[in-house]
Amino acid sequence: LQISWLGYNNTIGLNYSDYLIADKNLIFENEKNLYKEKIIYLDGIWNSHSGLNIERKYNQLPSQNSDTFTLGSFNNYSKISNETILVWSEILKKIKNSQLILKSSVIYSEIHFKEFFEKEGVLKKVVFKNRSKNFEDHINLYKDIDLCLDTFPYTGVTTTCEALWMNVPVISMEGFNFNSRCGKSILINSDLKDMVAKNKDEYISKVVS
């Protein structure tokens, strides 16, 4: 008996995998025929997060002590699509005093992103952080963020849970399959359904409003 859970959020497409654990925000009832596996629906959410043993209580958002509204995404650079960059660039244009913090260690991707943001005229508003030395340094960076932006169509999971644990709100956009609905499921089950956008225009609107 083989059951698929975290790590590969889709059908394996082969007969040797028997079950896939999901929830009804990720795989709709009328989509079960698209999966080789039988779907095990968990009540509420398919994911679990035990929390972090780190100080997370602070009284105000960074923008309350600054003229700058700070957006952030610590998702793996491989999840940042060109479409995502275009939407983020539009947001940076619409919010006058704003900046976007990105963090990873993939130099090649950073070069590509810089070229893309430069083309959109917002590179000066994007801050690239190197990979953190340790987990505590990584998680404390959330204290510098007013609002986290989820990637699409491949949404975040760990980074979304981390942000919410650190009391930082997250905007996500629901998509067309398991991978692109993870952010939606986490937010809905955190009683934050208003932070889920149905399309790019709504995503932008929710951030800039």
Description of each model-found segment:
Residues 5, 22-23, 74, 103, ...:
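Generic beta-strand/beta-sheet core signal
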